[in-house]
């Protein structure tokens, strides 16, 4: 399996990934740090969808690499704006230099998973972000 940008409850808060970084910064009303212009796209797959895709793959006879992810792309600047909105944050977006070797686009082709596993992600980004925000709020309160 090739797994693409999984997020959701249980994710590490300090691993440097966009979703956890943006949510923590937004909840703390700190500037959201954006590498580059923010127009690079990514796709994010909610953890339960990733798990269900892996289970379908394990229960199949399919051989070779299969992409497990969500093909719903979003520009990182739009993701940051959505998180600011969902957290009622006063954070502003601050641009920094682009990361070295940062691809402009990252989106899985999941046609094999759809066609041969009858699998596709079910949790939309807004719902997944809302659940993840609640999880991160709880974790920050524990610290």
Regions found by a protein language model. Name each.
Residues 1-16:
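Flexible, glycine-rich beta-alpha linker
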Residues 5, 9, 24-143:
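C-terminal substrate-binding subdomain of Rossmann-fold SDR/epimerase-dehydratase oxidoreductases
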Residues 19-20:
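Amphipathic alpha-helical segments in well-structured domains
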């Amino acid at each position: 399996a090739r797994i693409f940008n999984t997020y959701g409850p249980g994710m590490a808060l300090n691993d440097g990934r966009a979703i956890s970084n943006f949510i923590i910064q937004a909840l703390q009303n700190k500037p959201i740090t954006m590498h580059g212009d923010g127009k690079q796209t990514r796709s994010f797959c909610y953890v339960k969808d990733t798990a269900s895709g892996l289970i379908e793959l394990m229960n199949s006879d399919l051989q070779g690499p299969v992409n497990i992810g969500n093909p719903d792309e979003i520009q990182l600047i739009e993701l940051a704006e959505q998180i600011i909105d969902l957290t009622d944050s006063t954070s502003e977006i601050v641009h920094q230099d682009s990361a070295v070797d940062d691809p402009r686009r990252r989106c899985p082709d999941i046609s094999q998973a759809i066609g041969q596993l009858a699998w596709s992600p079910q949790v939309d980004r807004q719902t997944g972000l809302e659940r993840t925000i609640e999880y991160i709020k709880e974790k920050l309160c524990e610290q």
